[in-house]
Structure formats: C-alpha cells, structure tokens
Amino acid sequence: MPRSVNHVASRAKRKRILKLTRGYFGARKNVWTVAKNTWEKGLTYAYRDRKSKKRNFRALWIQRINAAARLEGMSYSRLMGALHANGIEINRKVLADLAMNHPEAFRAIVAKVKN
C-alpha cells in the first residue's frame, strides 16, 4: 500500500505562510524555509514589542508631564506626590493628554495641588 501523504493540507499550510510574508525583501517572501523562519521571528518581535509598548508609552507620558510641570515651577515627582497627597486620582495618560492638548486644565490641576 502506498504511503499516504496529505499534499492538499501541506500545500495549503505553505501557501498560508507565504501569503503572510508577502512584501518581505528577497528570499524572505518566496522561499519556504526562509519565509517560515522570518514569519516566526516576526511573531516573537510582535510579542516582545507588545510588552515594551506599555513601557515606552509610560515613559513618554512621564516626560510630557515633567516638561509641563516644570513650566509651572514644579518637578514631576513633586507633582505626583502632591496629587496623591490631595487624593486626586488621575492617571499619567490623562495627565499627559491634558498637558499637551489642554494646558489651561493642566495649569488648574497644578494650581490646586500647589496650595
């Protein structure tokens, strides 16, 4: 009895991976083994960068808050300490947005915690 191989499924799997690697440079787009390795490496980069995106955005928000707070004569750490001491629960993302897009609202918050 001849060996049973499922060529239909094998071909479909290869086509699926090669379709996902369309647009890559050189052999990465059309050579099966290279494309498969590139695709798998891309998945690891995506996983890693989903984690680092959170760190990067937090650092960006802190930089923006610090810059805006220093314009008001207060450092970032003193501002955050004063916010917590006054029981104002506002997260860094919103504070950074206020600092960039609504400076008058940010100024009002800083004035409230300065007193």
Curated annotation (Swiss-Prot):
Keywords: Ribonucleoprotein, Ribosomal protein, RNA-binding, rRNA-binding. GO terms for biological process: ribosomal large subunit assembly; translation. It comes from the Bacteria. GO terms for molecular function: rRNA binding; structural constituent of ribosome. GO terms for cellular component: ribonucleoprotein complex; ribosome. InterPro entries: Ribosomal_bL20, RIBOSOMAL_L20_CS, Ribosomal_protein_bL20_C. Binds directly to 23S ribosomal RNA and is necessary for the in vitro assembly process of the 50S ribosomal subunit. It is not involved in the protein synthesizing functions of that subunit. NCBIfam families: rplT_bact. PANTHER family: 39S RIBOSOMAL PROTEIN L20. HAMAP family: Ribosomal_bL20 (MF_00382). Belongs to the bacterial ribosomal protein bL20 family. This is Large ribosomal subunit protein bL20. The lineage of its organism: Bacteria, Pseudomonadati, Bacteroidota, Bacteroidia, Bacteroidales.
